[in-house]
Swiss-Prot record:
Name assigned to this protein: Large ribosomal subunit protein uL16c
Known partners and oligomeric status: Part of the 50S ribosomal subunit.
Entries under PANTHER family matching the protein: 50S/60S RIBOSOMAL PROTEIN L16, LARGE RIBOSOMAL SUBUNIT PROTEIN UL16M
GO molecular function, one term: rRNA binding
Organism of provenance: Trieres chinensis (Marine centric diatom)
Length: 137
């Protein structure tokens, strides 16, 4: 699972996901990408499940870039614990994703294989996504 080696703070505020992505919204490294169409938190487990799906379908023949990183902690309290006594313990890590963010990029495979691999990976994610190609200049 992905998680930072160290962070400035152990626990973070939830925050809000307003507006569209202004950064990380173009295919930069690969030839094809998977773009988010909705705002959400994507957990490190979901990222890993999607990554495994892509690498298995392409038979490890594709170059893969994961464009999001889970750098925010989500805390949870123990079941049946009373209110108060501070914030809960860190439960898992999430990446904050806005609409338009590129989640994964692929290169070195034909377009139909890339499209199918990213489509299969999209089933592992909790949002609607779109397959996009790089704009060649």
């Amino acid at each position: 699972m992905l998680s930072p080696k160290r962070t400035k703070y152990r626990k973070y505020h939830r925050g809000r996901m307003r507006g569209k992505a202004t950064r990380g919204n173009e295919v930069t490294f690969g030839d094809y990408g998977l773009q988010a169409l909705e705002p959400t938190w994507i957990t490190s487990r979901q990222i890993e499940a999607a990554r495994r799906t892509i690498t298995r379908y392409t038979k490890r023949g594709a170059a893969l870039w994961i464009r999001i990183f889970p750098d925010k902690t989500v805390t949870a309290r123990a079941a049946e614990s009373r209110m108060g006594s501070g914030k809960g313990a860190v439960d898992y890590w999430v990446a904050v994703v806005k609409p338009g963010t590129i989640l994964f990029e692929i290169a070195s495979v034909p377009e139909e294989i890339a499209a199918t691999a990213l489509h299969l990976a999209s089933y592992k994610l909790p949002i609607k996504t779109k397959f996009i190609t790089r704009i060649k200049i």
